[in-house]
């Protein structure tokens, strides 16, 4: 099919999942529960995966990191909206996706995903096509410039070997993607995001995906260590739960990954592990002028050049 051996991609993804969950468990002090799953014969999707989840830890209220490798007879609409020529194509997809919801409101929520998708177009003598996607983004509840700068600098450094254009392109893509249109609001401070990517050739495109995945711990752990023991009270916890509601709204209304999983017959329990354990909504919640909560909206939930 290509110069990419799918077993090589799978081995990398499984190793990445293991490295990340080991490091997070070390910080938290509680191990991840591991759930090996297999799609049942006769289901639309076939394949398997490993869901690792940590709940009610010391640092993380919920931290989920999932690997999946599935095959299906027909790409769902969410995967073909930018590639209409692949409508009806059989496909194979694998990836690692994580969302970590910290307990302390001063520690930001984080999301990271790296994935590969291969599809065989309908028709005679059609060559299979393969592409990569991925990225990471940070969603603070209380904004700190040094955290945002650090996160974006690591993202930029991970992409530098693949061209100076990649970080600004993928940062803009991230800002545009993680936007709640119905709220006219950014989800967080962004990061980098790319999809349907093969322009460097398959080997280098895979290498770029690897670099992004490998840089995750360097981007996130220093922020966790800096904020996890900060003192907080009921006010900060209440605001954290309110802002988590926005995370839920984005994932269920706008996220292509969630839609892809649900439309293709994916494993619902694993797809929805990105949901926070608790969230809240209140009607037209005001923010006190000059407060840290107002500062989040004015200075952090806006598109900015952090590096």
Swiss-Prot record:
Gene Ontology annotations for the cellular component aspect, listed alphabetically: cytoplasm
Pathway noted in the entry: Porphyrin-containing compound metabolism; protoporphyrin-IX biosynthesis; protoporphyrinogen-IX from coproporphyrinogen-III (O2 route): step 1/1
Keywords: Cytoplasm, Heme biosynthesis, Metal-binding, Oxidoreductase, Porphyrin biosynthesis
E.C. designation(s): 1.3.3.3
GO process terms (BP): protoporphyrinogen IX biosynthetic process
Catalytic reactions on record: coproporphyrinogen III + O2 + 2 H(+) = protoporphyrinogen IX + 2 CO2 + 2 H2O
Gene3D superfamilies: Coproporphyrinogen III oxidase, aerobic
Class of the enzyme per the UniProt entry, highest EC level: oxidoreductase
GO MF annotations in UniProt: coproporphyrinogen oxidase activity; metal ion binding; protein homodimerization activity
UniProt cross-references to Pfam families, sorted A to Z: Coprogen_oxidas
Site, as annotated: Important for dimerization: 182
Main location: cytoplasm
SUBUNIT field: Homodimer.
NCBIfam families recorded: PRK05330.1 (NF003727)
Functional note: Involved in the heme biosynthesis. Catalyzes the aerobic oxidative decarboxylation of propionate groups of rings A and B of coproporphyrinogen-III to yield the vinyl groups in protoporphyrinogen-IX.
Record's protein name: Oxygen-dependent coproporphyrinogen-III oxidase
Gene field: hemF
